[in-house]
């Protein structure tokens, strides 16, 4: 779904041309005003009459990753990137932007420039031109510290793991998660609104919000990964507001004690530590509770005798502590569940967003498999097809528009090979995203000559592997 940023010097290219450009991105300086005046032909597009004002332009995020060794000020880097974007006439699509070779400051300090948030437009075959867009630049560095554990008492399990965000471990995770159009953007907008309402002092007695997200659905659909990726993305977006961002992943199993009534006390103790973190106003804290049903089990089950009575105290303690965190503006609680019917209704009611994350759609399955094959091509595990041309697997929408192209007759052409990939994606209906990302490995293990695997042969092996995996999953 992601494609490199493209240059637009005329009308927006059709989707097939955009895909071709994605294979070999280039960024060319726009012609200066003096050069245009000296000629009778203008090479750069001019904003049409009645173009949007600055307030009406579409906000597009530009994420700028600094080198780990860079000591440049974020303000200076932001200004340099804004000047670079203003000096060029561009169309905006998700993907990397080449760093210009004539800018030594950016070359020395910036590792990557990435355009984000345009997927909703490109899904509808709309191209965002430079005069329609107001770029919002976010400058950040990745933390390489890794997770830290909160040691438990008496050799017990640690109660939580902690990451400083944005973390190197989660870099690229957001882009690798593919869902129905709009799900990720909906979560981003929700979090931004929740933080804004709190910062502006909106009266919670009149307008209620809890800053709690509940993602539910079958196992293997990427709910936990989406929570971590969301925290990473928000830490980048709010870097200018919060100097420190943390992700606290709660180890739910550590909160249950063999001693009666002790579990509720462990929950209270954990949230007391979290509250100490959020007392620092410049610290944005994300609390991740995976498989929250283990903590927020329905109290009705305990009353009926099917659950230990101590679980009532755990649920009560959890709800009480979450209500206490509500008064702090710099904390967001992210939760996941595989069994929503087992969660206490009082907890479900507190969640602002209850988003279902189901098995990937056909488009998502195709793009997941496509991203896997592109990675295998990048590292050389798969060889390019015959004819000397580099293999370019088409995006889902480009394939839909080019599937009747005469090139289909060419068994080594991009359309034909993308069609084989599409067939594999169709067969995989019902498989989780986790299983889909295993398929290329299983397919490679099944080929006769894995050391020199042709892309065409690999795709046929992928289809057979998908059929076998689906058959085994159905018993």
UniProtKB/Swiss-Prot annotation:
Domain of life of the organism encoding this protein: Eukaryota
Q: Name one GO molecular function term.
A: ATP hydrolysis activity
Q: In which tissues is it expressed?
A: Highly expressed in young panicles.
Which positions bind ATP?
217-224
Gene Ontology biological process terms from the UniProt entry:
meiotic DNA double-strand break formation; meiotic recombination checkpoint signaling; reciprocal meiotic recombination
Entry annotated with the keyword Nucleotide-binding: yes
Q: Where in the cell is it found?
A: Nucleus; Chromosome
Task: Identify the Pfam families for this entry.
Answer: AAA, AAA_lid_TRIP13_C, TRIP13_N
Q: Which residues form the signal peptide?
A: none
Quote the PROSITE patterns the UniProt record gives.
AAA (PS00674)
Query: Chief subcellular site?
Result: nucleus
Q: What happens when the gene is disrupted?
A: Male and female sterility due to defects in meiosis.
Main function: Plays a key role in chromosome recombination during meiosis. Required for the initiation of meiotic recombination and the recruitment of PAIR2 onto meiotic chromosomes. Essential for meiotic DNA double-strand break (DSB) formation.
Query: So what family is this one in?
Result: Belongs to the AAA ATPase family. PCH2 subfamily.
Record's protein name = Pachytene checkpoint protein 2 homolog
């Amino acid at each position: 779904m992601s494609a490199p940023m493209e240059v637009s010097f005329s009308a927006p290219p059709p989707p097939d041309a955009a895909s071709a450009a994605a294979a070999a991105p280039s960024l060319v300086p726009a012609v200066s005003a003096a050069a245009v005046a000296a000629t009778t032909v203008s090479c750069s597009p001019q904003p049409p009459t009645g173009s949007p004002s600055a307030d009406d332009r579409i906000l597009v995020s530009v994420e700028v990753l600094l080198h780990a060794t860079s000591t440049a000020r974020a303000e200076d880097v932001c200004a340099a990137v804004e000047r670079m974007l203003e000096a060029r006439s561009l169309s905006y699509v998700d993907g990397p932007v080449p760093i210009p070779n004539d800018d030594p400051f950016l070359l020395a300090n910036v590792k990557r420039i990435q355009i984000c948030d345009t997927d909703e437009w490109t899904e509808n075959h709309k191209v965002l031109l430079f005069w329609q867009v107001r770029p919002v630049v976010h400058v950040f560095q990745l933390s390489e510290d890794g997770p830290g554990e909160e040691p438990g008492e008496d050799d017990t399990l640690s109660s939580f793991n902690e990451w400083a965000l944005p973390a190197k471990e989660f870099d690229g995770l957001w882009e690798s998660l593919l869902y129905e159009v709009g799900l990720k953007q909906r979560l981003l907008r929700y979090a931004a609104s929740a933080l804004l309402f709190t910062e502006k002092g909106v009266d919670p007695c009149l307008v209620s919000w809890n800053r709690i997200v509940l993602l539910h659905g079958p196992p293997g659909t990427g709910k936990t990964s989406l929570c971590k990726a969301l925290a990473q993305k928000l830490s980048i977006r709010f870097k200018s507001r919060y100097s420190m961002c943390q992700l606290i992943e709660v180890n739910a199993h550590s909160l249950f004690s063999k001693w009666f009534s002790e579990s509720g006390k462990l929950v209270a103790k954990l949230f007391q530590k979290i509250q100490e973190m959020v007392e620092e106003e410049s610290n944005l804290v994300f609390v991740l509770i995976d498989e929250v049903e283990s903590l927020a089990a329905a109290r009705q089950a305990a009353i009926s005798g099917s659950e230990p009575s101590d679980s009532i105290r755990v649920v009560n303690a959890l709800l009480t502590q979450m209500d206490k965190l509500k008064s702090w503006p710099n904390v967001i609680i992210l939760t996941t569940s595989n069994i929503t019917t087992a969660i206490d209704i009082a907890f479900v009611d507190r969640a602002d967003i209850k988003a279902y994350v189901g098995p990937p759609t056909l488009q998502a399955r195709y793009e997941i498999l496509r991203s896997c094959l592109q990675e295998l091509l990048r590292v050389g595990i798969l060889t390019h097809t015959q004819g000397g041309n580099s293999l370019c697997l088409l995006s889902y929408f480009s394939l839909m528009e080019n599937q009747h192209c005469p090139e289909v007759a060419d068994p080594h052409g991009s359309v034909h090979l993308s069609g084989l990939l599409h067939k594999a994606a169709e067969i995989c209906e019902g498989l989780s995203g986790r299983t889909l990302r295993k398929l290329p490995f299983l397919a490679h293990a099944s080929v006769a000559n894995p050391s020199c695997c042709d892309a065409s042969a690999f795709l046929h092996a992928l289809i057979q592997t998908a059929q076998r995996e689906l058959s085994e999953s159905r018993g």
